[in-house]
Design a protein with these regions (language model features):
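Extended C-terminal subregions enriched in glycine
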Residues: 58, 130, 178, 211, ...
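Short Pro/Gly-enriched beta-strand edge/turn motifs at strand-loop
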Residues: 103-112, 165-174, 257-258
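Short, small/polar residue-rich loop motifs at catalytic or cofactor-binding pockets
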Residues: 118-121, 182-184, 271
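Active-site rim segments in enzyme catalytic domains, especially the processed small/beta chain
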Residues: 132-197, 221, 225
Length: 299
């Protein structure tokens, strides 16, 4: 039996980062999946996304996501127990090799991730008049989490132990005192050591893809935060390419022709919030996803 009293101290680790389109993207380190979002951005940077058709952008993101999530499920775990090769995954040579594995005209099959799904995440972003910013995300994984709460305050404990693996030799294997791989990743942007703004995406496993899609919409396609959040979404997950209804049946047919198994989910894909500082005038521009409760407001 592992003594729970040993877990009363929080673990504070340095953020990880990568550059994308002139901005520095800051993400949560392992045992979080922030490196998955950074890897996706590093791969997408190798494509001229501005000139690609909608079909090709959806396809490239789907193929990059399948590979990035496969690498996530292979390597990510609590670094206190198993070293996680963050620098190796994000190195130019490795990223070039990963991109070379992406076919531009054919869907590649990967074993579907067996990471458990969970939709119950809340995200908020705030920036004050002094330029201090908060990017906050919270989730207890399931309804009422583990079902266990603190007797003094009624705070529920999460049930993220579901994300452990049962293979004894896997980096994310279940073990006492160990933190499981998790999906919740609040993001932050800077440029030339100045704050650009906080951003985040809800939606369980979608979050890493959501980060990449949100930033690509803004920095490749020139959208403002609200437009970038409103834009139609796709997500290659569990062997299926999910498309929101707004993509339409014609696009689904085109992508099916590339070998994707396409599905229109019954509910929207994810949600998000973002606050971005306009570099030209310093004005803060916010966006709030209409797929979820929330709104953008100034004070």
């Amino acid at each position: 039996h592992y003594p729970l009293r040993r877990q009363r101290q929080m673990c504070i680790r340095d953020s990880i980062r990568a550059d994308y389109r002139g901005h520095t993207v800051w993400e949560c380190p392992p045992n979080g999946q922030g490196v998955t979002a950074l890897l996706l951005l590093r791969m997408m940077e190798r494509f001229d996304l501005e000139t690609l058709s909608d079909r090709d952008r959806i396809h490239v993101l789907a193929e990059a996501a399948k590979l990035a999530y496969h690498l996530r499920d292979t390597y990510l775990a609590d670094p206190s127990f198993s070293p996680v090769p963050v620098e190796w995954l994000l190195a130019d040579e490795q990223v070039d090799g990963f991109v070379a594995m992406i076919s531009r005209d054919k869907a590649t099959e990967y074993a579907p991730s067996d990471f458990p799904d969970h939709p119950h995440t809340v995200y908020l972003a705030a920036v004050d008049e002094d330029g201090m910013a908060v990017s906050l995300i919270n989730s207890i994984f399931d309804d009422f989490g583990s079902g266990i709460s603190t007797p003094e305050y009624g705070v529920l404990f999460h049930s993220r132990g579901k994300a452990f693996r049962l293979e004894a030799d896997h980096p994310n294997a279940i073990e006492g005192g160990k933190r499981p791989l998790h999906t919740i990743i609040p993001g932050m942007l800077s440029q030339d050591d100045r704050l650009v703004g906080p951003f985040g995406v809800m939606g369980g496993q979608y979050q890493a893809v959501g980060h990449a899609m949100l930033l690509s919409n803004m920095f490749n396609l020139g959208m403002n935060p609200q437009q970038a959040l409103d834009a139609p979404r796709s997500f290659a997950h569990a062997g299926v390419l999910q498309l929101e209804d707004s993509h339409g049946a014609e696009m689904a047919g085109i992508l099916s022709g590339l070998g994707h198994e396409v599905d229109f989910p019954s509910s929207p894909i994810g949600g998000g919030q973002a606050i971005i500082r306009d570099a030209a005038n310093g004005v803060l521009v916010a966006g709030s996803d209409p797929r979820k409760d929330g709104h953008a407001s100034g004070y």
